[in-house]
Amino acid sequence: MSTDRLTAHGVFVEVEGLGVWLSGASGAGKSELGLELVSRGHRLVADDAIEFRIDAGNPAYLIGRCPPLLDGFIEVRGLGILNLRRLYGDASVLGEHRLDLAIALDARTEPSADERLTGRRSTVNVLGIAVPEISLPRRVGHNLAVLVEAACRDHRHRAAGYNACDDLVARQAQHLIAQAAAAANPAPAASATGSPVEPHQQD
């Protein structure tokens, strides 16, 4: 078995310029989510079987592609096999892409208090490379396609050094500091005319 190649289960799509590996248990809705993302203008790389290899030009990255036999096809429960090139045009399918983010469709309990702020974030090891992974709760009524798009945009900002949770915590800290300073140095009381009250001078 090659140590620089791996065939993995799931759906591989290009979203917002990022290569996203959708994983989860059988029946989790990976292919349906992939189809919805394609309908929103994103591109399918592979469904069901994804061939990952280490990028020869940059060993720190992985490249994912579809086996030639399955190129452009997706299997959706209730619809069967669909040819996306026929349905959405050649631009809906991409030959290969770098793997940037893994998203696991998760049917576990609700996120903890900390996870509500930070998200369920970890890494998954693929051929010795740690790939950022987000676990998205799968619930009735959730628009997973929108969540995946938002996750990709947020991932780009994080890669550039911005973290929304850290930003909010810093903003709250600044607000508390300002409140404490205002309490320690109260403003002079105002008169009925709106001007500060001057101390009474005795003759």
Regions found by a protein language model. Give the residues of each.
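Accessory recognition modules or surfaces
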Residues: 3, 25, 56-60
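Conserved NTP phosphate-binding and transfer environment spanning the P-loop NTPase/kinase superfamily
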Residues: 100-203
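A short, structural micro-pattern
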Residues: 7, 95-97, 128
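Pre-Walker A adenine-sensing motif
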Residues: 2-13
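Conserved nucleotide-sensing/catalytic segment adjacent to the nucleotide-binding pocket
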Residues: 43-104
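A short, compositionally biased
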Residues: 7-9, 46-47, 118
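Glycine-rich phosphate-binding P-loop
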Residues: 16-44
